[in-house]
A protein has these predicted regions:
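Transmembrane helix boundary and interhelical junction motifs in multipass membrane proteins
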Residues: 23-52, 132-143, 152
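Membrane-interfacial helix-loop-helix
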Residues: 1-26, 56-135, 146-152, 158, ...
């Protein structure tokens, strides 16, 4: 029980009083979590605003963006790049070998790929999927790799998507707590 309390206290300090150490911790946590997909860390990090004493302000929003959301977005992009890379380079052999277990063939992938032309609205769709707070990133990263999305677009849109996802959660929780306090 004490270990759980200490964990909550450490996370709470990292969110409510961020410093260089907490930035590195958030970066490392998000990178590792994208590789292992253990925790819904977007929810865990944003729930720490429930313990906030001060009103949710522009200054706090800016601090959360700079010290929490951006490092988390960069870390998550680095972590999810491994899944993307495996799907990008091993997608066809993997689908041909294991696709029968999922009732999926390379022809199915080609049909799906023909619907995506590599235009701006494909990237908007990818970004929208990255914004959904409870959607696991593994399938989104794998599909982006299999469909051979540009690595530069993937990395940039993943950083933007994860950063905005975190800020959306902070905004909902922060403004929700402000409403409850009134």
């Amino acid at each position: 029980m004490e270990l759980a309390y200490n964990f909550v206290q450490v996370v709470q300090d990292a969110i409510l009083r961020p410093d260089f150490t907490s930035v590195l911790s958030i970066f490392f946590l998000s990178t590792v979590n994208e590789l292992t997909a253990v925790l819904p860390y977007t929810v865990i990090l944003s729930s720490q605003l429930l313990f906030i004493q001060d009103p949710f302000s522009v200054a706090m929003f800016t601090k959360l963006l700079l010290f929490i959301a951006i490092p988390m977005g960069i870390g998550a992009a680095i972590g999810s790049s491994l899944i993307y890379g495996l799907a990008y380079f091993g997608g066809k052999p993997g689908i041909e070998k294991f696709g029968k277990y999922f009732q999926l063939s390379w022809e199915d992938i080609k049909k799906m790929e023909s619907k995506f032309k590599g235009s701006w609205y494909d990237e908007i769709l990818f970004l929208a999927l990255r914004l959904v707070p409870l959607l696991p990133s593994f399938p989104v990263s794998a599909v982006a790799g299999i469909l051979r999305m540009s690595p530069v677009s993937y990395f940039i849109l993943t950083i933007i998507g994860f950063t905005l996802r975190m800020m959306i959660m902070f905004t909902f929780v922060g403004l929700g707590m402000g409403t409850l306090a009134q």
